[in-house]
């Protein structure tokens, strides 16, 4: 599986986990996606997208 495809699947998995009420699992998926993007040297726009989702989770944690 190509790295970009795997990263996208991890992002979607994280999104689905948020909808299921599993923010901790979502964070794990996003972190794995970000790490893979960095390893592959493709963390530009994908990295920014993942970091935005992680920041949203952090904001939800501080609100709750």
Region spans (language model):
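Alpha-helical junction/boundary sensor with strong preference for TPR arrays
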Residues: 37-40, 44
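Residue signature of alpha-solenoid helical repeat architecture, marking inter-repeat boundaries
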Residues: 4-5, 45
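Alpha-helical linker/edge segments of TPR/alpha-solenoid repeat scaffolds
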Residues: 52-64
